[in-house]
């Protein structure tokens, strides 16, 4: 007797794709039954598996240029990317998280990704899809927090 997969000329689903297929089936069932669905609960963007886009050009250009003070130079403050010490009077770039970098180190980095190499503080991007993903992720976290607070309030 032939197996189900041989009989239907198909391959078993790999576990990584199981969630996506289940989500698509759930969407199809909801549409066929005419039910209202929460499209926010279905995440087809898959940004978690992709690298974030580069930082917005306007944001990168507007990063403040800071002059290294004698105190910073005496403290042997280093660029976290190239690990060279900053010299007194040298002009460096400061990210919103207040980390300092050589321009020649941080500009190529921000041309590839939108976060600080040290603390992962994210800068805005020019990608509307990624910005929408970040907003949706924040909304989900807020919703989970509200539900947790409600649950805790019920059982305290």
From Swiss-Prot:
Enzyme Commission number(s) of this protein: 2.3.2.27
Record key words, sorted: Metal-binding, Transferase, Ubl conjugation pathway, Zinc, Zinc-finger
Pathway: Protein modification; protein ubiquitination
One MF annotation (Gene Ontology) recorded for this entry: zinc ion binding
Reaction catalysis annotation: S-ubiquitinyl-[E2 ubiquitin-conjugating enzyme]-L-cysteine + [acceptor protein]-L-lysine = [E2 ubiquitin-conjugating enzyme]-L-cysteine + N(6)-ubiquitinyl-[acceptor protein]-L-lysine
Alphabetized Pfam families for the sequence: zf-RING_2
Zinc finger (RING-type): 79-120
Keyword Zinc appears in the UniProt entry: yes
Highest taxon of the lineage: Eukaryota
GO biological process: protein ubiquitination
UniProt xrefs under SUPFAM superfamilies: RING/U-box
Gene3D superfamilies, A to Z: Zinc/RING finger domain, C3HC4 (zinc finger)
Function: E3 ubiquitin-protein ligase which accepts ubiquitin from an E2 ubiquitin-conjugating enzyme in the form of a thioester and then directly transfers the ubiquitin to targeted substrates. Catalyzes monoubiquitination of 26S proteasome subunit PSMC2/RPT1.
Family: Belongs to the RNF181 family.
Record's protein name: E3 ubiquitin-protein ligase RNF181
Provenance organism: Xenopus tropicalis (Western clawed frog)
